[in-house]
């Protein structure tokens, strides 16, 4: 019998309940007179009306954009960078695994570059690409690609040898073994790591938007800072959190739907 805490509805209800208690506590704390916390972090009843009063637009003059545009711009940047990193890491990982010498020479380089924080690439990206979408996409790519490439090589080593021997005994060529055995075996693990790295990629693109770009969700927060508008800052932070959570759920759905053969 399935335990109650393993049921999807119960898990959803607990999450919804925890957020409800948080919002209620947040709102009630604003009624405690001169509360220094709510002066810096105004409750939702104060910063949410900002969205409706501005007709869902953020910014000044020609720099203003609707909140939908800000969300879509940021999503395009982070998903483009992650897609390029995912495909590139699979290709490079497969190529390096074809030769032990290539692995010996190049994996140490990947291992040195992988721990570098994505935000550290911002100055270089601005010099190379200037202010634009390519800067954000490059930063996301650099923050994810090297980790995924190392993971691809590790996943290839974990492919059970009996799978490969069985395919070879059945007359499978090297190409068919790679196509039908090795690649399907490594895809679930690499995609799982891609999903886990989404948080780092999400933070990287937001940091890029805050430091050098003129649009996106990160710019919403910076606009609030420049205007000394804590309501706008909190609004941007909440939208960032909700959007990031939604994308993570979508990636989890893709993982369960399209990589169903994974045993993990």
What are these regions (language model features)?
Residues 68-80, 103, 110-113, 130, ...:
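Alpha-helical membrane-interface segments at transmembrane helix boundaries
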């Amino acid at each position: 019998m399935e335990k109650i805490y393993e049921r999807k509805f119960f898990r959803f209800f607990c999450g919804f309940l925890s957020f409800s208690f948080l919002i209620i506590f947040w709102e009630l704390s604003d009624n405690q007179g001169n509360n220094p916390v709510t002066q810096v972090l105004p409750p939702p009843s104060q910063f949410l009306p900002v969205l409706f009063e501005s007709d869902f637009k953020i910014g000044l003059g020609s720099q203003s954009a609707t909140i939908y545009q800000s969300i879509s711009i940021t999503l395009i940047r982070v998903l483009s960078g992650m897609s390029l990193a995912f495909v590139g890491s699979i290709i490079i990982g497969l190529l390096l695994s074809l030769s032990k010498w290539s692995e010996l020479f190049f994996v140490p380089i990947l291992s040195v570059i992988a721990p570098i924080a994505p935000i550290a690439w911002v100055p270089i990206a601005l010099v190379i690409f200037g202010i634009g979408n390519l800067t954000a996409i490059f930063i996301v790519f650099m923050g994810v690609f090297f980790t995924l490439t190392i993971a691809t090589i590790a996943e290839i080593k974990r492919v059970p040898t009996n799978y490969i021997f069985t395919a070879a005994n059945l007359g499978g060529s090297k190409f068919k073994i790679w196509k039908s055995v090795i690649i399907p075996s490594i895809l679930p693990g690499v995609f799982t790591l891609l999903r886990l790295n989404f948080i780092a990629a999400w933070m990287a693109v937001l940091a890029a938007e805050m430091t050098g770009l003129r649009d996106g969700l990160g710019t919403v927060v910076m606009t609030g800072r420049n205007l000394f508008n804590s309501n706008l800052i909190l609004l941007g932070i909440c939208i960032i959190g909700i959007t990031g959570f939604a994308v993570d759920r979508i990636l989890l759905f893709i993982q369960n739907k399209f990589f169903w053969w994974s045993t993990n």
